[in-house]
Curated annotation (Swiss-Prot):
Membrane-spanning segments: 8-28, 31-51, 71-91
Source organism: Acanthamoeba polyphaga mimivirus (APMV)
Protein name: Uncharacterized protein L813
Keyword Membrane in record: yes
Record localization: Membrane
CC per GO annotation: membrane
The entry's keywords: Membrane, Transmembrane, Transmembrane helix
Amino acid sequence: MTTVAIDSTDSLESFSMVIFWYVWYLIVRAIVYYVVYIISKYLIVVIYIIFMTFCYSGETDKVTAVQIGSVFITAFLLVFVKIMFIGTYVVMTIVDTVNLLW
């Protein structure tokens, strides 16, 4: 009768390396998503400022409908961009985790 020694440290080390690199991947992806989110947020604000500058009516005591609409559209875009980036990150993290464990 022969006995075979199974070394479980190799599989444990490889599994821990997979987890390490997966966590590292999630951190890097979160940083990239955050940078793209910040850039898009400031780009929306810059477009808003440019639009408000060109659509300024010249009257200081009246607010035009275009200015009010610009404020609402900008607020909507800022909220939409935030929800889109957070939602995309959460969904992609779930998909990647399921793919890793499957």
